[in-house]
Amino acid sequence: ICYIYLNFFWGDEMKFQSTRGLEKGISSAEAIVRGIAKDGGLFVPESFPNLYSKLKEEKNLSYVDLAYKIISKYFTDIKAADLKEAIKDAYEGRFDVTVNNGFMELYHGPTCAFKEAALLFLPQVMKRAKKAIGVKEEVVILTATSGDTGKAALEGFKDVDGFKVVVYYPNNGVSPIQQRQMSTQEGNNVKVFAINGNFDNAQTGVKEIFGDEEFKKSLLSKGYILSSANSINIGRLVPQIVYYFYGYFKLVEQGKINQGDEINVVVPTGNFGNILASYYAKQMGLPINKFICASNDNKVLTDFFRTGTYDKKRELILTESPSMDILVSSNLERLLYEACNRDGKIVKDLMKSLNSNGEYKVSDDMKNFTNEFYGNFANQGEVYNAIKEKYKREGYLMDTHTAVAEVVYEKYVAETGDNRPVLIASTASPYKFPRSICKALDIDVEKLNDFEVIKELNKMTGIEIPENLKDLDKKQVKHKEVWDKDEMRKALLSYLK
């Protein structure tokens, strides 16, 4: 397999370019602060440094040290000392990754979801990127969330000087625990809006605000510039590469594989950022064979990898893995860019077709390029069954999103016979979706509220409740506003007035 765009020049400056072709040679600090390119495209690094051969010689690097070695190759215009400090402030004593029986648990942090791997780091690096390019204005972080991103962004950015963070989530479209995590958020620079609509409406609304030059000018005159904490921001994507290296080295340490062995990676997928980070890790030399893309009933990606047609013209189904209830996977655009040999015009035309016709079809060459990806989906019955069986057999408790990955992985092995060692991204604590887990385990919680359900699940399984979810129901609700999906600009202005 050829690894594309390898960059053999150590210490080189890394520049970024837009997937839609308009901008090239953008510094990392600017790409991070702006979040999205002028043509609506997403920033990608102009090359991928081959780091695996170097890193495999270094034994037992801590997460913080490994993060520095990887991230520093991309964000080259932020001073080394500043970057080290950003990584330390983000992770030390706050975030941990464990690999347990092939499950890479990414939820041992303040919000109990994998998003914090990126969202504890983003505010720290953005603060320093802002300094590097001399931005004086206050940066307003706009985020649409299907559940986990919102809380992780609020937690990461709260009380960080020079920033405000505004989160939009679909009213009744996130779990009660997720909603309570956001509505009780503390901090003097945070705002949460529920919108009447689904996640795609929220994400589209945020993208439209970013694309509205007049609106942005009027904000600038008030001393504000906009940026994003969604995974469209390259400052969020790059730190996610780290845990694939870390997980791989853990498998080596545990004697599950030898250095250099190829593994498969399974990722429960919504916006395509997490699985794309594993693809980027492979471009950096990490030995990955197959990227197994697991969807719930919203199986747009499954259909895409099978047919080469991306079709969002379907009803969004609300499932028990709400963080994956998405019809437009924004980060797929970055993979398409690699698939067409970095031809921005092709990507631009595909995205235009998606916007105006609700679908696009890629060429045969591009379809063949995606053969390293396998897509499949899991329905609710399969998810419940997987949670129950795993717990019964091994005493291991998965959340609903991780269970989607487990089901799809089993389907992959059954179809292909490929049972080489695997890393399954476990993306959230089961305690974030306690009612679903109890249903799967046949624990009757019909008459209990979600916070009582947490306690019941703990009583029945003995699995510890994460510290930050323990007294969530006792916290004061601070954010109660609900706006219509067409009033997102208005909501923002009401906060920034």
Each language-model region and where it sits:
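PLP-dependent amino-acid enzyme catalytic core
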Residues: 2-497
